């Protein structure tokens, strides 16, 4: 049975990757279908109730700069906002919000339902229809066929998902949801490498059974941060505190005593878990010398008594979970509402993807999110936006696009995955970006919004606000460079008391701001130097661009040097055996990874600069040397 309409783009899955993919495609004018097994769970936060953080907040800002929904929903759902690394340099500062699950889901669903060109339909997908290595549609569990030349799969943990609690296990996509068994079996027939990964979640606790007075209160920041470039603090709901407590030796003894019934340590779980978000039993095993581990007690919302104890993800049996929870200070009488569990699921080797997130072997088939081996809402959302955007571009007959490593954390993410692959759930950190001084949270819009507008992702309202902000920054920088103060100026009376060294020669306002003891707000508050910019984000840009100009220029010079051949394309059908001078090891690695560009090839372990030079000479001789847009 065929559905009565044909679509340009079909998105399978309604999590963070799927919603951003569907919205991006629809914003660009493509007739888009979002298929989900349950409309009520669209935008569901399956694990921790938080958005952002180190590296992750940068991705959220980039999604937002390209017109995505995650940051907007967070501003409406965030019940505690903090700026992490606030005492450090701007490159590593990151916004994190504790989010109300229900409010977040509601806002995402509202955005989806009001998006033109987007149809939502409730059916699980069982089959992928492929003809001559070209995807042509999908078939749902009731045999309904939907036709489309592009399909974006955002299946999360649902592919052959298996949930583990102690030695008990059962099939599931997440707690309370069925797995996608038929689709997983169909995908295993494709010429794409497949593996298994694992993730987990902690038990949820009844807040009424917790003694918060025994814990350390953790309040949000004042003034309140805002996640979206078009958001404001008035959108935030009521703000509340989180709390901090710790495990202890008794907790660790309880965990050690239960390891014989742990699916992780008895060989039942084969999938590899996330290195940077390990289970509590993994922490006890790997860091045996530590007598205590921090636990963040995070509320799941304003209208629920559920608490998420961040730091004790576990798949231990329920009786062990209850005992370990009750051994923790403040939770001696705690009641578990939902047990913690681990989930194993299929993922596909991201080295089999182009940097557009289209598979290299099946035209029109795109993967985004945990199916590519990543972990985290933010990583999923960023991939979803890119995949949905590129599916739409492909339908429109236009060239696909992916930011470079020096343009966005999204570029770093995709390049890492498609070039190096991953054997464990991949999460983003600022340390993964070699050009992080240029890839700050605060300038994500300046980096990406113009490109988003060009691609059709950015609406008129966002574009107007962005251009106004960008113009105000440029005009203010011009003013600071063009206004000067002289040693005999009457303004010295208010200025010199604020300086470590008094003015002895003429200096521009920009020179004054560059001094370490001076900041923009202070300078603008002095009579004769203001009034300055009212928009705090624009003012922050001015300060950063002035104070870090030397470092920024140095990094830009490094990029210009590296980029000379970064985008030189490697033809997909290039036979590396025919390239004279390449070693057998290099040939094997290039055939295994199949890099899209010289830049990707250069980052493969074991590929030497000499091998890159040989490739460039070969491409030039054959007239094959061309670059991406």
Swiss-Prot record:
Q: What processes in GO biological process is this protein linked to?
A: tRNA methylation; tRNA wobble uridine modification
**Is NAD a UniProt keyword of this protein?**
yes
Q: Which positions does UniProt annotate for FAD binding?
A: 13-18
Q: Could you tell me which cysteines form disulfide bridges?
A: none
Q: Which residues bind NAD(+)?
A: 273-287
> Which Gene Ontology terms of cellular component type are present?
cytosol
Pfam families in alphabetical order: GIDA, GIDA_C_1st, SAM_GIDA_C
The listed locations are: Cytoplasm
Cofactor field: FAD
Which branch of life, at top level? Bacteria
Example of a GO MF term: flavin adenine dinucleotide binding
Keywords assigned: Cytoplasm, FAD, Flavoprotein, NAD, tRNA processing
Functional note:
NAD-binding protein involved in the addition of a carboxymethylaminomethyl (cmnm) group at the wobble position (U34) of certain tRNAs, forming tRNA-cmnm(5)s(2)U34.
Q: Which family does it belong to?
A: Belongs to the MnmG family.
PANTHER family documented for this protein: GLUCOSE INHIBITED DIVISION PROTEIN A (PTHR11806), PROTEIN MTO1 HOMOLOG, MITOCHONDRIAL (PTHR11806:SF0)
| Subunit description | Homodimer. Heterotetramer of two MnmE and two MnmG subunits.
What is the designated name of this protein? tRNA uridine 5-carboxymethylaminomethyl modification enzyme MnmG
Q: Which organism is it from?
A: Shewanella denitrificans (strain OS217 / ATCC BAA-1090 / DSM 15013)
Gene for this chain: mnmG
């Amino acid at each position: 049975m065929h559905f009565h309409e044909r679509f340009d783009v079909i998105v399978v899955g309604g999590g963070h990757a799927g919603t951003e993919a569907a919205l991006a495609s629809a914003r660009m004018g493509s007739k888009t279908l979002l298929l989900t097994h349950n409309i009520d769970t669209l935008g569901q936060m399956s694990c921790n109730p938080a958005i952002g953080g180190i590296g992750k907040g940068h991705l959220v800002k980039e999604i937002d700069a390209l017109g995505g929904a995650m940051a907007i929903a967070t501003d409406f759902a965030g019940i505690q906002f903090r700026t992490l690394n606030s005492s450090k340099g701007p490159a590593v500062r990151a916004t994190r919000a504790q989010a109300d699950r229900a409010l977040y889901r509601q806002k995402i669903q509202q955005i989806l339902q009001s998006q033109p060109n987007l149809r939502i339909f409730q059916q699980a997908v069982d089959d992928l229809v492929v003809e001559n290595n070209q995807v042509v549609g999908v078939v749902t569990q009731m045999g309904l066929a939907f036709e489309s030349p592009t399909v974006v799969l955002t299946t999360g943990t649902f592919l052959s998902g298996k949930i583990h609690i102690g030695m008990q296990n059962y099939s599931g996509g997440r707690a309370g949801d069925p797995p996608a068994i038929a689709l997983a079996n169909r995908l295993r027939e494709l010429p794409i490498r497949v593996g298994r990964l694992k993730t987990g979640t902690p038990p949820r606790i009844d807040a009424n059974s917790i003694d918060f007075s025994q814990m350390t209160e953790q309040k949000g920041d004042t003034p309140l941060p805002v996640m979206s470039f078009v958001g404001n603090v008035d959108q935030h709901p009521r703000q509340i505190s989180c709390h901090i407590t710790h495990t202890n030796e008794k907790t660790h003894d309880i965990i050690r005593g239960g390891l014989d019934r742990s699916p992780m340590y008895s060989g039942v779980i084969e999938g590899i878990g996330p290195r940077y978000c390990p289970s509590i039993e993994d922490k006890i095993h790997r860091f045996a010398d530590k007598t205590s581990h921090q636990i963040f007690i995070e509320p799941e919302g304003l209208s629920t008594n559920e608490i998420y104890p961040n730091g004790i993800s576990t798949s231990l049996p329920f009786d062990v979970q209850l005992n370990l929870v009750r051994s923790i200070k403040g939770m001696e009488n705690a009641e578990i509402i939902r047990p913690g569990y681990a989930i194993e699921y299929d993922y596909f080797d991201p080295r089999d993807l182009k940097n557009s997130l289209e598979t290299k072997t099946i035209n029109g088939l795109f993967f985004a999110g945990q199916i590519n081996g990543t972990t985290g809402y933010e990583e999923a959302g960023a991939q979803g936006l890119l995949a949905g955007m590129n599916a739409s571009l492909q339908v429109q007959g236009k060239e696909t696009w992916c930011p470079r490593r020096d343009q966005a954390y999204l570029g770093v993410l995709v390049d890492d995955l498609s070039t190096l692959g991953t054997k464990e759930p991949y999460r983003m950190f600022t340390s993964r970006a070699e050009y992080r001084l240029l890839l700050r949270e605060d300038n994500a819009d300046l980096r990406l919004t113009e490109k988003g507008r060009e691609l059709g992702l950015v609406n008129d309202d966002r574009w107007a606000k962005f251009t106004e902000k960008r113009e105000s920054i440029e005009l203010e920088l011009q003013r600071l460079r063009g206004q000067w103060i002289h040693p005999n100026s009457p303004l010295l009376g208010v200025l010199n008391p604020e300086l470590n060294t008094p003015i002895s020669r003429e200096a521009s306002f920009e020179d004054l701001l560059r001094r370490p003891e001076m900041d923009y707000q202070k300078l603008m508050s002095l009579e004769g130097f203001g009034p300055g910019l009212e928009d705090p984000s624009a003012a922050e840009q001015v300060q950063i661009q002035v104070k870090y100009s030397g470092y920024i220029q140095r990094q830009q010079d490094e990029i210009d040097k590296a980029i000379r051949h970064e985008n030189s394309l490697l033809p997909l059908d290039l036979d590396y055996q025919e390239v004279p001078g390449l070693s057998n090891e290099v040939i094997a690695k290039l055939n295994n990874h199949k890099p899209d560009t010289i830049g990707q090839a250069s980052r493969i372990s074991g590929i030497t600069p000499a091998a890159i030079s040989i490739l460039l000479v070969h491409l030039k001789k054959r007239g094959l040397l061309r670059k991406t847009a």
